[in-house]
Amino acid sequence: MKYQPLYDRVLVEPIHNDEAHGKILIPDTAKEKPTEGIVVMVGGGYRNDKGDITPLKVKKGDTIVYTKWAGTEIKLESKDYVVIKESDILLVKS
């Protein structure tokens, strides 16, 4: 992939928890947004109060939980991703 998130941005591949709903078809517009994903790439960091670059705490491959309305949904190379700020990440699964 030829892309790189900037600053404190994180590229996340959402994990869709598709649950069986019997024979009821739920349209995409009514489905819950995923709030869990796998970190694909991280930006170089953010500037702290002293002007220094502080690296991000998450790393490629981390499974994370993020806020429901975080980030921007994008499609790269026919795959769905979300670009979020590190501050929108609530948990890192260990």
Swiss-Prot record:
GO cellular component, one term: cytoplasm
GO BP annotations listed: chaperone cofactor-dependent protein refolding
Pfam families (alphabetical): Cpn10 (PF00166)
Chief location: cytoplasm
Assembly and binders: Heptamer of 7 subunits arranged in a ring. Interacts with the chaperonin GroEL.
NCBIfam families membership: PRK00364.2-2, PRK00364.2-4
Protein family per UniProt: Belongs to the GroES chaperonin family.
Name of the protein in question: Co-chaperonin GroES
Gene it is expressed from: groES
